Structures are given as C-alpha cells and as structure tokens.
Amino acid sequence: MLDEALLPDGSFHPDWEPWSQVSQEEGSETIHTWEKVVRRLEREMGLTHFQDSTATSLNSPWSVDSVPWILGSDDWALIEKGLEQRVRLMKAIQQDLEGACRLLSERVLPPEIVFLHRGYLPQLHGLEPSPTLNAFDLARGPDGKMWVISHRHDITSGLGFALKNRSILSRALSTPFQRCRVRRLADFFRSWRDTLESCSSRTPRNCRVVFLSSEQRRVKAEDFFLANYLGYTLALPGDLTVRDRQVWLRSLGGLQRVDVLWRTVIGRDLDPLEIAPQPCDEWGLPALFSAIRANQVQVVNPPGSGVLESPAFVPFYRAICQKLLEEDLLLPSAATWWCGEPKALDHVLSNLSTLVIKSAVSRWDNRRQYGAKLSAGELSTLRQQILADPAAYVGQEEVHLSTTPSYRGGALHPAPSGLRTFAHSDLFGNVHVMPGGLGSVISSDGERERECTKDVWVRAEGPLPPHHSLWPSASDESAKTTTSF
C-alpha cells in the first residue's frame, strides 16, 4: 500500500513536515491532547451521527480523526484540474442526453445504460441549464495518481461533515493548521451560495432558497448544519406546497414563495404525481415537476442527473470525453466492465472472485458485492444473477487504498483511506472545486466499512488571503472568531 504521510525511508513527506514538527516540539503527549480536544469539540457541536446512544468516542462512521489528511499544492493542482474537467464532462453528457443525443445515435454509449437506469427522468428534458453540486470519491492508484472510484450527481452527502471536521480540527490543531498554511473552505461555500441566489429572476436579496431535506435521510443533522451555515431555511416536503405551478413555503406568517430548492431528496422521489413512489416512501412534493417545467422554481441538482452516477458509464468515459470535449481524460477511473457487452461479461464471469460487482441501474440497489469475500456458493449465486440480467451489472477492479496516519488506542497507525471531494458549477459554466474534502478511514478487516472521517488539508502555495467567515448569525461570535473554515 502507498503511504500518504511517510516516504520509503520512514521520514515524513515534505507536505506533512509542519504537522510532524509541531507534534515533536510540543512533546510526546501532543497527539493525545489533540485527541481529547477533538472529542470534546465534537460533543459540543453535536453533529456526529452515532450508531447507538451509548457511543461516546471514535466508534461512529461520522466521527472525525484527530489526524488530518494533508495534500500538497502540486498534488492538489492535478486533482483540481481533473475534477474541473469531470464536472464539465458530466454537464456535457447530461445536456447531450436531454438534447441532440449524439452519444446514443452514434453508439458512443449503449442506449441500455441510460434507459435502464432509475435516475433517468425524461419528464424533465429540454430545461434551461442548471448549476450542479457534485461529489467524487477518489483513491490513490498504484501509479501514484488519484483515481476516480465513483460519482455523486443526484444528491451529495458529506459536505456538512467536511465543514464540521474543518471547524473542529482548525481549533483543536490550531498551530499545525497555521504552520501548514491550509487553504480555507469559506470561499467555496460563498461561491456556492452566490450561485444558488443567482438562479432566480428576482434579485439575490429577494431570492428565497430552501434546503429540502427528507424525513428518512439518515444524517439529517448534516442538512441542518449546512442550512444554518449558509443562512437557508431547512424544510421537509410537507412544509411546502405547489399552487399555480409555483412552490410555496408554509409559515406562521402565511405562504412564502420559493425560488430555489437545494435538495437532498432522491430525484425519483420528488414528485409522486409523475413517478409512483415505492411503498416505503414518505417524501415528495406533488406537482413539483410542473413547477420546474414552468420555470417557476430552480431545483438543484436538477432531477434526472442521477443517471450520471451509473458505473456503466466508466468504460466509455475516454471516448465520451473526446467526443464531447475533444480532450483526453485527465483523472483515470478504476477499470470497469459493463456486463451488457458480451466480451465484458465473459471477463467479469472469469474474474468474479477478484472484482467488485455493482448495480448498473441504481446506486440505491444493495448489489455491491466484493468477490474476494464470497464463498463458492455465493459466487455461484451471483453468477446466475448476472447471467439473468447482464445489463444490470458492472464488474470493477478493487482498488487498494493508500494509507494515512490514524490515531487509535493511544498511538498512530497506518489506515486505508479514501477521499470524497466536492465541486460545483455555476450558471455560466464555471467550475469551483472545494480545496479539501471528506476523508474516510476504512476498516482493514475486509469489511471495507467507514470507521471515521478525516479533515483534508490542502496546503497553499503562497501566503493565505484574509479569511472571512460565512456564519450568518451575529449571535454566534464564537464560531466567527474561533473557526477557520
């Protein structure tokens, strides 16, 4: 495994040296002290999604590790450029699928990949371009480059936890944070807020943005944290109504018109009048799609963008990038085979015990299976499932994650780690990449479950510009003066 922090001779990577120097200067108990401060701040913020009511320490998948993931400016510049291209590519694909359909008519992309995916919503084709907020899961490949493992375009999660992690570690580790000259996150959120408020025909001052959450969303505290940080109203579908193809927010003062909905409700579940909900669904705003088609409300991300999450796109990205952007793909993806093609199907079935099998029709289907963990009987069952519906499956190379230092049991240990990054586009096609992200420490026992999260520090190449917090409330002076988002 590649080590993000240590060189082959055991010394720290130059990008990690300021963090290492501070830990040595302040004594052997420094990291343990940081750990105690991190746990205290985490309890005070109250955002951690614990798996049970008795969890009090680093045993929740959303707890933050007291050791950050540090990336140098040169390393990040390559990642940033690749992510910027990925966002442009995803927008170009969606515009093509909703317009000229060159990818399908010229057989660059097999039509089954699009039409079988549950995120494909032809009800909303022909709309004006909309801004998007995207997430990309990355892992360090054996060539030392970051590889893209998966995309998130329908709804994204983790942005609030990345913000929480930065709030905690910038305070608990204030000295190494300053020594490392860590790039701030506030400018990214500021540009995202400006983008949302520019979506309305009304002036930004009069534009009403509502953060649409869900009753069943597992980490709803994250939605509350983000809405509070950006100064938006957090609402559930039942708090809204559609009248005369306009969306309104119910309030004690009467109905208030909504211009922009930033959603964390799955696209297929947004409007039960147009797409029949599943029996367990409790969300949805009837007639929302009619308001969208009438250009009376902007919904971000646009419903229908979920189709872009299909891993079946991956084998065709290089050809698609050349066709639509006339560029070479900058960030590689994990090798992937769509079973809807006979040769790819043969390869997957011949290597079933070494591949990761995923659903090609919905990321919400619980079909991800690691062949290396399955028994002979389970592999046989999986083989029959794939043969029964090949187009619904992909096989993907299992990427062995690089390691970062993680504080466990009173000591530092190398832990497999993955990285989720975020980027957004505005109405003018400009792409903004968040200089940081949400790191995940993955269990090394073969279960590949998240053990905790990490703050991701991207080091600045030169002096940092003045920092201005985005906290909207003057009453939260402590957050304004002590956090370094």
Task: Give short role names for the model-derived ranges.
Residues M1-F485:
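Preference for protein termini
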